[in-house]
């Protein structure tokens, strides 16, 4: 079976000292680039989508595409619900065949976050679906949800253990100074906090907001326990900027099969770099 949960992927990464990249896809071309590049490099990857992406493309359509491409390339893939907040929405997508879920209740008080996440875990584990949850909040924007940088909360290491034990999650997304979107200046990551979290929690740890981070910072987070790296904005920016440039230089272009090639090439460079930064080439 080529469509898999992320649990084994991330456990393998934790044992092997590398990270699995989760690429947020937005259209067919993004998925083609991610899967083709990963297959060529024999690298494990996760195909992730926010609620907005699943609404845009359709859950059944995305599942069919991932399944078909995994079989075509003989390459295991996970399709993952990124930053989903509603139980009924998650349940419907799990019943449709999704095998990896992030329930994001990080905006709630600690006790309510635990309660909401545990409800999802109890349901998902009945279907052998892996569950990620977040403790603390990232700044920036994901879909229509805006978090003010000033109000963004970092993950508390001691609370992280309580949270993991109380909810039964399979992986924990931590906040240590990253944000959604690209950075105006280099972020200062709290590596000591991450090291502390690793001492309290033995689950695979997840880093959101990795677009634009330096190779050095990404590799340092992996050394300190990060097993999954999320990338979204970097792919979108590469796609859109390349497309704008091409159409500016070739105003006569009308065939998407032609003018999308430059955008795909730009995204391919991003995917290859992220796979290299994660150290997961040859690990699939």
Swiss-Prot record:
In this entry, which stretches build a coiled coil?
Answer: none
Q: Which Gene Ontology biological process is one annotated for this entry?
A: D-tagatose 6-phosphate catabolic process
Cellular component per GO?
cytosol
Q: How does the cofactor attach, per the note?
A: Binds 1 zinc ion per subunit.
Question: Quick one: which residues bind Zn(2+)?
Answer: 83, 180, 208
Q: Where is the active site?
A: 82 (proton donor)
- UniProt catalytic activity: D-tagatofuranose 1,6-bisphosphate = D-glyceraldehyde 3-phosphate + dihydroxyacetone phosphate
Question: EC number(s) for this protein?
Answer: 4.1.2.40
Protein name stated in the entry: D-tagatose-1,6-bisphosphate aldolase subunit GatY
Lineage at the top is:
Bacteria, Pseudomonadati, Pseudomonadota, Gammaproteobacteria, Enterobacterales
